[in-house]
Amino acid sequence: MQVEWQPEARAELLKILDYISDRNLVAADRLSQAIEGATVTLAQHPHVYRMGRAPGTREMVVHPNYLIIYQVVDRINILSVLHARQEYP
């Protein structure tokens, strides 16, 4: 199944990676690689992750501190990348 990043989710990810890289470049690179690897798994098994708090979404824990919020339709739409302590929706 095709994975498509929504512009807002891509912007959130870049903001997170910029913040982390200012403090620890290696950690930012590891998180980036973890997210990239997770989206490959997501494409193969989109329903393996838990149901999301928002109706029609699912949540993938990529790292203990970060979640990817996505929706499965005719493709996988990545809607948001959040810190685990962040409140939503």
What is the predicted role of each segment?
Residues 66-67, 71-89:
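Enriched for short, Lys/Arg-rich terminal
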Residues 2-57:
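Basic, Lys/Arg-enriched alpha-helical interface segments
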Residues 62:
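Conserved strand-loop elements at the edges of beta-sheets that form or border functional pockets
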Residues 1-2, 89:
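Absolute protein N-terminus
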